[in-house]
């Protein structure tokens, strides 16, 4: 870590610090994550594709980097850039195979350190997530020029990104023990902990590209269909929405997480919108309006469904309801068909990192598939 670096926002705000990770230029949407742990899971989450993540935890890197906690295949880092306050000068964890900065350099991720991340977060909280860039080394230039580079990039609004993070080829994750069910999982940016949760429950997962057709899904004769998390604007995902409607029409049990919640919502007739600064953290409370229970959840989303708590609405597939909302701001956190054949949540029951309050939803999906046999 050495040399000057700058985080430049599209509204002209500039934060000067030191280079952290690779040297050069990176562009993306500036967002912040309030998680106090789990930075490796955050960096490797495909949902952060094309985003510069600002860490609110004051010190990052204490536990280094290991070969077990990544949420992407091949341990790929998906964030566009990383901004931290105080990078740990030493690694202290028995599983660590190297330092965080070494891994950022190896994967050519441009970052910045020694900036006032609290000031950055307050700015983004007030002004909203926005286009940004991190510049160091030869990429540094006059601030006005850097602002123009930042403004010239594509907005996250209207960005179709699921295909950029999805697997190009189908693959299978085998269950632990005898197979009980087969699930077709549409990879829109799937985290590796999701198939692991299925595997622990005896589910064989056929992970399919985001371009998969309903015919390809039906050929697998799955007991259920899963819609994964992922990046980008759900309003662009017309193909996936159309496939989801065919799945609903066929009566196949369906479960969605995060981006998958927005896809199911769109398939049921709801619209989506871009949030001011989104939900990104591991301590976000969600109300289940069927039971009144509150779960503390892990979340990572900058778009949401339009709707109100407990709202019922008609769809071509029967009555549906807004099943969950955020206790902090009322944002829609789940939808379902009234007959229970399809349901989804905006948060991450697989956690990684985060609480396991909502892990029971995987068992709920199994109950749905059992009842459909």
Curated annotation (Swiss-Prot):
The record's catalysed reaction(s) read: hydrogencarbonate + L-glutamine + 2 ATP + H2O = carbamoyl phosphate + L-glutamate + 2 ADP + phosphate + 2 H(+)
Q: Which SUPFAM superfamilies match?
A: Carbamoyl phosphate synthetase, small subunit N-terminal domain, Class I glutamine amidotransferase-like
Q: List the disulfide bonds.
A: none
CDD domains linked to this entry: GATase1_CPSase (cd01744)
Per the record, the GO terms for biological process are: 'de novo' pyrimidine nucleobase biosynthetic process; 'de novo' UMP biosynthetic process; glutamine metabolic process; L-arginine biosynthetic process
Chain spans, region CPSase: 1-179
What family is reported? Belongs to the CarA family.
What does it do?
Small subunit of the glutamine-dependent carbamoyl phosphate synthetase (CPSase). CPSase catalyzes the formation of carbamoyl phosphate from the ammonia moiety of glutamine, carbonate, and phosphate donated by ATP, constituting the first step of 2 biosynthetic pathways, one leading to arginine and/or urea and the other to pyrimidine nucleotides. The small subunit (glutamine amidotransferase) binds and cleaves glutamine to supply the large subunit with the substrate ammonia.
Q: What is this protein called?
A: Carbamoyl phosphate synthase small chain
Q: Which organism is it from?
A: Mycolicibacterium paratuberculosis (strain ATCC BAA-968 / K-10) (Mycobacterium paratuberculosis)
**Gene designation per UniProt:** carA
């Amino acid at each position: 870590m050495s040399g000057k670096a700058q985080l430049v926002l599209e509204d002209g705000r500039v934060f000067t610090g030191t280079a952290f990770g690779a040297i050069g230029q990176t562009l993306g949407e500036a967002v912040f994550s309030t998680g106090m742990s789990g930075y490796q899971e955050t960096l490797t989450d495909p949902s952060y594709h094309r985003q510069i993540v600002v860490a609110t935890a004051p010190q990052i890197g204490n536990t280094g980097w290991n070969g077990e906690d990544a949420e992407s295949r091949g341990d790929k880092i998906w964030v566009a850039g990383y901004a931290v306050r105080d990078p740990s000068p030493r690694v202290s964890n028995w599983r660590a195979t190297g330092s965080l900065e070494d891994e950022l350099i190896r994967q050519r991720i441009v970052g910045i350190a020694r900036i006032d991340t609290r000031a950055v977060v307050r700015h983004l909280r007030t002004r909203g997530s926005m286009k940004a860039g991190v510049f160091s080394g030869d990429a540094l230039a006059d601030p006005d020029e850097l602002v123009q580079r930042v403004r010239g990039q594509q907005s996250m609004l209207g960005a179709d990104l699921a295909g950029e993070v999805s697997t190009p080829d189908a693959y299978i994750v085998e269950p632990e023990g005898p197979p009980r069910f087969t699930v077709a999982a549409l990879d829109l940016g799937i985290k590796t902990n999701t198939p692991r949760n299925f595997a622990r429950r005896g589910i064989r997962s056929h992970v399919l590209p985001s371009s998969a057709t309903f015919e390809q899904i039906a050929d697998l004769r799955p007991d259920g269909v899963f819609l994964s998390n992922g990046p980008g604007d759900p309003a662009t995902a017309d193909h996936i929405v159309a496939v989801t409607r065919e799945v609903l029409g066929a009566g196949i049990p369906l479960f969605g997480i995060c981006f998958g919640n927005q896809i199911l919502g769109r398939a049921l007739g709801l619209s989506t919108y871009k949030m001011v600064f989104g939900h990104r953290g591991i301590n976000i409370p969600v109300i289940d309006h069927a039971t009144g229970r509150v779960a503390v959840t892990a979340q990572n989303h900058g778009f949401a469904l339009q709707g109100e708590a407990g709202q019922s609405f008609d769809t071509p597939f029967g009555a549906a309801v807004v099943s969950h909302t955020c206790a902090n701001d009322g944002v829609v956190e789940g939808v379902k068909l009234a007959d229970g054949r399809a349901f989804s949540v905006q948060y991450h029951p697989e956690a990684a990192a985060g609480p396991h309050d909502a892990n029971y939803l995987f068992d709920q999906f199994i109950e749905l598939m059992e009842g459909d046999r």
